[in-house]
Amino acid sequence: MPRFGAHMSISGGVSKSFARGESVGLDSMQIFAKNERQWTAKPISPEEATAFRTEQQRTGIHPVVVHDSYLINLAAPADELREKSIAAFADELERCAQLDIPYLVTHPGAHTGIGEEAGLARVADAICRLLAEGVGGNTMILLETTAGQGTALGYRFEHLARLFELIPYHERLGICVDTCHIFAAGYDIRDPEGYQTTFAELDRLVGLTRVKCFHLNDSQKDLGSRVDRHAHIGQGCIGVEAFRMLVNDPRFADLPMIIETPKGEDMAEDRMNLALLRSLVQGAE
C-alpha cells in the first residue's frame, strides 16, 4: 500500500509537525523546512534537529518530504533574483540534510519571458552548481510536474526529460507527480486508457523509476486549463476513478502519496480525504 500523507504545519518548530501528522493518521508527511514566504530564516538548532528525529522515531511517520519556498525561481533571468533563489535553495537542501530528510520537492521555475529552453538551461545550471559542490548531502531533489500557469516550466514531461539530460547527477534527481497539475496541463488520467497513456509517456521520456513521490489532489479546473486549483479527492474535475487506479498501481505501491487539499485548522478535511484514498485500495478493510 502507498504511504499516505499530507502537508503539515511547522508552527512552533519543525518537530511539532509530527504530532499534527499523528493526529490525522499519516504514514508519510510533507512540510516546509522554514517559512515558505521569506527568503531567509534562523538556522535549525541542534536541539530542534534532535527533537525532530526523536518525534519521527516515536510516530514512525516516513518518509518526510520538504517542499521548497514559493519565492525560489531557479529559471529567473534576472541575476539578482536568480542568485537569491540559488542561495535559498542551497539553504533548503542543507536543512533537509540536517534533518535526514530524503526528498526536497521543487517546481522547476518560471522563465518569465526568456523562453522555455533558456529557462530550463538556467534551472539545470543552478542545480548542477549546487550538486557539484555536494550541497545537501544525499538529499534528492524532486522536480514537480506543474500546471503550466503563466511561464511556469515543468508542465510537459519533455521539460523534465530535458532537465535529466542537462543534469548529470541522476542519483540526486527524481520526480514528484502532482495529479492536479498534470491534469491541468492536459494529461487525462480519468479513464484506464488515458491513465495508461499518460504514465507510458512519462516512462518513455523520463522513466517511472524516477518517480519518488505523488501529490494527490483533485482539480477545480478542467483538463488542459493550465490553472492550478486543488480540490478534495473525488470532488473535482478528475474524479475518484483516477485515484483508485493510482493507489492500486503496483509500480507505485510503496511511494509516499501526499494530499495538498484545502483544509481548516482542525484538519478534518485531511482525515476525510485520507480515509477515502485508503478505502480505494483493493483489499483494504
Curated annotation (Swiss-Prot):
Cofactor: Zn(2+)
Binding annotation for Zn(2+) 2: 144, 178, 215, 260
UniProt entry keywords in alphabetical sequence: DNA damage, DNA repair, Endonuclease, Hydrolase, Metal-binding, Nuclease, Zinc
GO MF annotation list: deoxyribonuclease IV (phage-T4-induced) activity; DNA binding; DNA-(apurinic or apyrimidinic site) endonuclease activity; phosphoric diester hydrolase activity; zinc ion binding
GO biological process, one term: base-excision repair
Catalysed conversion reaction: Endonucleolytic cleavage to 5'-phosphooligonucleotide end-products
Gene3D superfamilies for this protein: Divalent-metal-dependent TIM barrel enzymes
HAMAP family in UniProt: Nfo
Name under which the protein is recorded: Probable endonuclease 4
Organism, as annotated: Chloroflexus aurantiacus (strain ATCC 29366 / DSM 635 / J-10-fl)
